[in-house]
Amino acid sequence: MRDVTVIEADLSDAQHQTAVLYLVNAYARDPMGGGRDLPSAVCDRLIAGLRRHPTSLVFLAFDDATPVGIAVCFVGFSTFAARPLINVHDLAVVPECRGQGVGRLLLERVEAKGRELGCCKLTLEVREDNHAAQRLYQKFGFGDMPAEHGMVRNWFLQKGL
């Protein structure tokens, strides 16, 4: 990496919009993202949807002017802490830049934003077979959620609508 910078995206900026679409689609094409392009209808709705969502936060990593990584996050709320939290919904780095610290830079920026907002924690989900991402998250301090009587592994479930 020459000169990677991470910024909070301005989703009204055309360059940032292009970078978001490029990076999310690159993630979708990756085996960890499903292995195929996003449908054009999704691409058509993505930026407007993120802009309309009241708690979306998007961070972009650039190597000079080239987009190389993205973190798409949403601010939530912890009822047990009565404070906001940030969920890292998508974190992706283009294949040619993996293992070079881009993911860590994105997480550092997300963490800084969380501290700025007074968040109690960061959350994320990761595929069971995505060992590289798991190593990054563990090195960054992510772990199983604490419970009264020790550590408990949580499930992340979904139901299509």
For the regions a language model picked out, list residue spans one by one.
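Acetyl-CoA-dependent GNAT
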Residues: 2-83, 89, 107, 113, ...
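C-terminal "cap" of GNAT-fold acetyltransferases
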Residues: 3-5, 13, 118-161
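Short coil/turn motifs at secondary-structure junctions
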Residues: 76-78, 96, 129-131
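Short coil/turn segments at alpha/beta junctions that flank glycine-rich nucleotide-binding fingerprints
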Residues: 84, 100, 116-120
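Structural detector for helix-capping/boundary residues
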Residues: 89-91, 140
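A short, internal acetyl-CoA/4′-phosphopantetheine-binding micro-motif in the GNAT/acyltransferase core
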Residues: 91-98, 127
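Conserved acyl-CoA
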Residues: 94, 105-121
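Conserved acetyl-CoA-binding loop-helix of GNAT-fold acetyltransferases
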Residues: 99-112, 135-139
